[in-house]
Amino acid sequence: MINEYGTTAAKKEYLKRQFAKVQTPLEYEPSDAFRITGPFAAAYGLLLVLVISFLTVGVFSDEMNSESRFVYYSTKYGPTRGAAAKILAVFIIATMLYWSGMLLMSLMSFGGMGTGGAFASIQTESPYSMYGLNFLERYLLILLSGYVACLFSAGMTLLLFVKTKSAISAMSISFLLFAGLPLLAGNDAFESFRMLTPDRLFHVQDNMNNPCVYQFGTIVCSRVTLLIALYSFLLIPTVVLSYRGFRKGSM
């Protein structure tokens, strides 16, 4: 497996270190609750992306009204502090909605099925996984990855709203980034690209079953790490460009 995915010396060394950290589980403990809740959390997160996109455009809906826009941009701090406050409100709403929704879903799921096997190694389910995590740690990583996806969706919706001046277009295009790109599955020409699309943030559990690694110069990282880092970084320019657009009154 190391020879298959380690196409360079650096990748092979990285895979060796990762597999060396994995401890062979000496006993089995049922972890059905975490195995079921993980994919369900991903699907629920995708639904929250749509809801957050809808609420995001709602925050700036008044600026679509010509009379409201005139008043908003004629004030001293409307184009600056006002725009910044509204953008901040978008991410506060997204954060509160995502974590409250996930907390409620987790309480309902684990309340009914229990939390047995939380500290069991994921190797009991995926023997060839290079991640030395237990089921609880993997679940928390699923939630973190989904949170990054929701923030990125909110940022993209803001940016698209500035450029298209249409709430429907902004929501539709943003949601298609997560729900439409998976339709490329099975097309070999887009396979490498599809593995790094935003929707993969909701496929942490599947990504962990594949020891695929990426190399940038001397830096080697796993797909899960790359996805979280990539879209956390891309969130920054979406916010900056959105702020500049609202500040200039480009709407």
Q: What are the residue ranges of the model-derived segments?
A:
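Alpha-helical transmembrane segments and their immediate interhelical loop/hinge regions
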Residues: 68, 83-84
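Terminal transmembrane helical anchor/hairpin motif
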Residues: 27, 116-137, 168-172, 177-249
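Transmembrane helix irregularities
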Residues: 75, 163-164
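Membrane-helix interface linkers and caps
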Residues: 64, 70-71
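Transmembrane alpha-helix boundary/hinge residues in polytopic small-molecule transporters
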Residues: 67-68, 155, 171
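Membrane-helix interface/capping residues of multi-pass secondary transporters
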Residues: 79, 166-167
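Short helix-to-coil transition segments within interhelical loops
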Residues: 73-79
